């Protein structure tokens, strides 16, 4: 549980004698376990009965001028003041960063005035903020004093914060990831020693020039660097990377475990830190800020991304976590910003901590249940039942003209469409399926036959094996009891010789002897539903790791090897993997049956179909165009990190191997096609023993022997 630390304001006279001590806190009374209590008792040596305890809080995102205005108001001072600190520079600082004190000024150093923000100037503000105040006239440098008016919006914000603070859930956990770049003395020998010390991580050391490539490690991939060390984490992310002059460290623990000795010199060049904060209570990810909070955060064009007031810290909001990226380390700033986000989220969003939307009288319905010019779908709240209403269940009542649903908090909902069309109460199926929440909405037709209605009104759970005959249009995420049409281009491809019978006025399935449809992966491929496939990189990794055929945005993605393609075909809908199956239904029966695909009709589209040809075989070792085999088994063991491999470097310009495979390369999907082609050419040369001195005619003859396109 995060605790917002107390703050201290100390007013002194011309002799630096303490006149007033204000202990600012959002809790009740002085926390005797806090470092602030220890500071008052042992350093200020002020009796506790002289300390004024106020339910106040100096917001750390304020500019120094705003802080002065707040303090003038707090102390009821209407003359010029100077604020300073005993351990940090605040309003003023010397050029050599000596701590400024208005009572011990020196003319021999250049003085700088800060116009920045409190958390940037006072680096420990989140943990231990002590502001000393002196009237300018009482100091040696009264010309440095100023008076600032308090910002009324700051006081208004503080008032709401104090009022709502007891209800805030500040239970969260923080994970951090450092992205550090250092200048280092780890040259080629030092990097090689790291490779030699490696035991289990994916690692690559590469040195290349115009003529040769030297590789060592256990994960041989080519890159554009003349000298590079790369080490990957278990999840495939890059943990450490170095070019011999600088080193980027994304996993600090791994780096400290692998450095060969203590003589490594590290000079920080730049760093940023990403904090991932996991929340115990969900928030609303889309926040619309009031203009009165411009001193807290800055809105961006994307309403789930906020910026700090200095635009150096970015905050990404999600339902159950917050990501905070900072340029430089500020102690506990991620926790303080999370505290502000939780408060602002509660302040500006009606949907608060409860996941039951209907607990709140001012209801913000989903977009799929909202009023438009000609539709009134949002239910209204009423205070009582009409006399002619009959009880249908414990929470549902009905009359000839009206239906009423009563939620768990005894709030009554009914439909009141003036046109008389949308007067049938139903429930939003998506919310019930995902969260078991019954959220009413008004429908054109009677909903009493639907699964969600039966569950919400009669507490009858449906058989999950029963599939709804209504076929969704492509583009919607398919739940476990639904099916959907394929995109038009693929619907024509898969179902050109198949037939389907639908009811005339809707898309309800009457019968089919077999028709390709989209089904949720919750049945046969539940593991895939846990994956979010967002980027091209995600698609490439998924297809090649799982050896599957995937349709995404009208493009078919195959794994690298033709032999890896099986009969299963998957399709991406809103970043979620679904499967393609064959649906069957008899006209006189309700049950819909599914068959898995017996053949992969897309396999014939694969652009690179060549037979595996043996290149060389000896003593149980066999090299083929499809890989290297030991006693008939494909060799997949990681290479030794203690061995180096030398090979010729090549150019892809006017290369005969590139020209030969050009018809294949145009179908390749990758982030760096040039590196892919270069890797392909080098692998082909190594497999077939092709030297750099071979003529174009010789190379073409060899390729035609082993790779007949």
UniProtKB/Swiss-Prot annotation:
InterPro entries reported in the protein's UniProt record: Poxvirus_early-TF_lsu
Any one of the GO BP annotations: positive regulation of DNA-templated transcription
Keywords recorded for this protein, A-Z: Activator, DNA-binding, Transcription, Transcription regulation, Virion
Main location: virion
GO molecular function: DNA binding
Signal peptide per UniProt: none
Localization in the cell: Virion
Keyword DNA-binding: yes
Pfam families: Pox_VERT_large (PF04441)
Record GO cellular component, one term: virion component
Similarity-based family: Belongs to the poxviridae VETF large subunit family.
Complex and partners: Heterodimer of a 70 kDa and a 82 kDa subunit. Part of the early transcription complex composed of ETF, RAP94, and the DNA-directed RNA polymerase.
Cited function: Acts with RNA polymerase to initiate transcription from early gene promoters. Is recruited by the RPO-associated protein of 94 kDa (RAP94) to form the early transcription complex, which also contains the core RNA polymerase. ETF heterodimer binds to early gene promoters.
Protein name from the UniProt record: Early transcription factor 82 kDa subunit
């Amino acid at each position: 549980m995060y605790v917002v630390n107390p703050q201290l304001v100390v007013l002194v006279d011309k002799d630096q004698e303490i006149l007033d001590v204000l202990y600012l806190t959002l809790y009740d009374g002085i926390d005797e376990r806090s470092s602030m209590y220890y500071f008052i008792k042992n350093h200020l040596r002020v009796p506790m009965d002289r300390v004024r305890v106020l339910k106040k809080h100096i917001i750390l995102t304020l500019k120094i001028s705003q802080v002065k205005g707040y303090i003038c108001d707090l102390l009821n001072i209407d003359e010029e003041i100077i604020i300073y600190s005993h351990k940090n520079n605040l309003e003023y600082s010397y050029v050599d960063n000596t701590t400024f004190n208005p009572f011990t000024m020196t003319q021999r150093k250049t003085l700088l005035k800060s116009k920045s923000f409190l958390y940037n100037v006072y680096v420990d503000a989140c943990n231990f903020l002590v502001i000393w105040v002196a009237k300018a006239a009482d100091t040696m440098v009264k010309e440095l004093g100023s008076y600032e008016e308090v910002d009324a919006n700051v006081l208004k914000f503080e008032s709401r914060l104090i009022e709502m603070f007891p209800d805030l859930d500040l239970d969260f956990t923080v994970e951090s990831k450092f992205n550090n770049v250092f200048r280092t003395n780890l040259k080629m020998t030092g990097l090689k020693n790291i490779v030699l010390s490696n035991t289990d991580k994916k690692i690559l050391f590469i040195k290349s020039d115009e003529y040769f490539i030297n590789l060592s490690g256990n994960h041989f991939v080519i890159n554009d660097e003349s000298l590079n060390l790369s080490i990957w984490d278990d999840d495939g992310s890059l943990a450490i990377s170095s070019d011999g002059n600088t080193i980027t460290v994304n996993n600090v623990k791994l780096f400290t475990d692998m450095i060969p000795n203590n003589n490594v010199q590290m000079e920080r060049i730049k760093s940023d830190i990403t904090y991932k904060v996991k929340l115990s209570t969900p928030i609303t990810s889309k926040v619309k800020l009031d203009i009165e909070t411009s001193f807290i955060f800055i809105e961006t064009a994307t309403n789930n991304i906020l910026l700090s007031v200095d635009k150096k810290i970015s905050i990404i909001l999600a339902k159950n976590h917050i990501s905070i990226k900072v340029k430089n380390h500020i102690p506990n700033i991620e926790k303080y910003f999370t505290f502000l986000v939780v408060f602002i989220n509660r302040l500006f969003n009606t949907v608060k901590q409860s996941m039951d939307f209907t607990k709140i009288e001012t209801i913000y319905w989903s977009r799929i249940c909202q009023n438009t010019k000609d539709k009134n779908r949002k239910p209204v709240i009423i205070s009582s039942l009409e006399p002619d209403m009959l009880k249908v269940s414990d929470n549902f009542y009905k009359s000839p003209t009206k239906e009423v649903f009563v939620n768990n908090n005894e709030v009554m909902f009914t439909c009141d469409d003036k046109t008389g069309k949308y007067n049938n109460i139903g429930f939003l199926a998506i919310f019930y399926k995902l969260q078991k929440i019954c959220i009413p909405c008004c429908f054109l037709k009677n909903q009493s036959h639907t699964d969600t209605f039966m569950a919400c009104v009669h507490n009858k759970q449906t058989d999950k094996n029963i599939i709804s005959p209504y076929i969704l249009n492509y583009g919607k995420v398919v739940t476990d009891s639904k099916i959907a049409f394929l995109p038009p281009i693929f619907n024509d491809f898969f179902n050109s010789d198949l037939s389907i019978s639908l009811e005339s006025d809707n898309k309800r399935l009457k019968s089919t002897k077999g028709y390709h449809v989209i089904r949720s992966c919750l049945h046969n491929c539940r593991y895939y539903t846990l994956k979010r496939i967002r980027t091209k990189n995600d698609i490439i990794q998924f297809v090649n790791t799982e050896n599957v055929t995937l349709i995404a945005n009208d493009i078919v993605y195959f794994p690298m090897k033709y032999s890896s393609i099986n009969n299963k075909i998957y399709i991406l809908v809103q970043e979620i993997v679904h499967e393609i199956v064959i649906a069957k239904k008899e006209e006189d029966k309700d049950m819909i049956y599914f068959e898995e695909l017996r053949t992969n009709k897309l396999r014939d589209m694969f652009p690179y179909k060549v037979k595996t040809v043996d290149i060389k075989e000896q003593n149980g070792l066999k090299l083929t165009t499809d890989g290297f085999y030991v006693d008939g088994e494909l060799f997949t063991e990681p290479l030794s990190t203690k061995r180096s491999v030398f090979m010729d470097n090549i150019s892809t310009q006017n290369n005969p191997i590139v020209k030969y495979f050009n018809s294949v390369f145009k179908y390749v999907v990758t982030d760096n096609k040039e590196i892919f082609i270069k890797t392909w050419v080098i692998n082909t040369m190594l497999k077939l023993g092709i030297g750099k001195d071979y003529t174009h005619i010789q190379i073409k003859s060899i390729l035609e022997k082993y790779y007949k396109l």
